[in-house]
Amino acid sequence: MRQAIFIGAAGFVGAILRFFVSSAVAFAAPRNFPYGTLTVNVSGCFLLAAFLTLFRERAAADGLRLAIAVGFLGAYTTFSTFAQEIYDLGKAQRILAAIGYAALSLALGLTAVWAGVRIAHFIEKY
């Protein structure tokens, strides 16, 4: 039960941060593309990869790992909004934008995971 409370508390923080980051990016960027969701999902990929790499072999950190990975980053990132935005772009007859958004999200997400792992390995060295 205690673990569920930590996951929920971390999820609350992740959801609030997603709202602020996505809103700030959407305010600053053109409104014709889902830049806010792209930003939170790509940054979430980076953070999850770095965090899991740094804490992969620390058994004492299992509770922290769940709170951050499942709670905080699970609430911070959003696959359902990503899918809905692709659908909305397609429904608006913006097929190339929908395909581009999906491809860009995947490419940047995988690049962010790679960068997160590399930076975590660099941190571990020093």
Q: Where on the chain are the PLM-derived regions?
A:
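Membrane-interface helix-loop junctions in multi-pass transporters/channels
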Residues: 1-126
